Regions:
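Glycine-rich hexapeptide-repeat left-handed beta-helix
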Residues: 1-12, 46, 52-54, 60-62, ...
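Extended, small-residue-rich solenoid/repeat segments and analogous flexible loops
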Residues: 1-30, 34, 42, 192-193
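Short Cys/His-rich Zn2+-coordinating modules
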Residues: 17-18, 37-38, 77, 98
Length: 193
């Protein structure tokens, strides 16, 4: 894992979180308790702070990049950023899910429990309401979320963290077994947890 100080700022990573040895963390980054950062993720807090809330999961190949001082990234609690998602700034409230390959531009705000579907783009400055599902380039609302949908998102995020904790307890050197998501899935299929 590459952890680099930048401009006098060093990443702060909770001891209760897992950061893959194949990820890169640079500058003003705060990773709170029970966060999981998967392989290939690049988190660059060079120009503004990146703060990742408790129980959030950052999957393989996610890019978090602050391009200017006006583009901090705040990721709330129980958020899921799926493979290949890119955030160039923005504020994500709790229980947000950004799906595979989506692009979030600077100065956006994404409300509690919102879901941005695969390969969508959230344009600069857009305020996404709470509990909506959005899709497209640029995104449009395709449906509302119920309170139950939001609670299911919270459970899904919590599940990823708990699953990793169980695996880590079973394997003292779990990091070497979890270098890639496909290896992780193969392991899960072989073990009953």
């Amino acid at each position: 894992m590459v952890i680099m100080e930048y401009n006098g700022k060093t990443p702060k990573i909770s001891n209760n979180s897992y950061v893959s040895p194949m990820s890169t963390i640079i500058g003003d980054v705060v990773i709170n308790d029970n966060v999981i950062i998967w392989p290939g993720s690049i988190i660059r807090g060079e120009n503004s702070q990146i703060n990742i809330g408790e129980y959030s999961t950052i999957f393989d190949g996610v890019i978090l990049l602050t391009r200017s001082q006006k583009s901090p990234i705040h990721i709330g609690r129980y958020c899921i950023l799926e493979t290949g998602a890119t955030l160039l700034g923005g504020f994500l409230e709790d229980y947000v899910q950004i799906m595979e390959g989506s692009l979030i531009f600077e100065e956006t705000s994404i409300g509690e429990g919102a879901v941005i579907l695969n390969k969508s783009q959230v344009p600069p400055g857009l305020v996404v309401p709470a509990r909506v599902v959005m899709k497209g380039i640029p995104v449009e609302i395709i449906r509302q979320q119920s309170r139950n949908d939001v609670l299911e998102q919270k459970e899904r995020a919590h599940h990823y963290t708990q699953l990793f904790i169980k695996i880590k307890d079973l394997l003292p050197n779990a990091e070497s077994y979890l270098l890639t998501l496909p290896d992780f899935v193969k392991f899960l299929l072989k073990k009953e947890i």
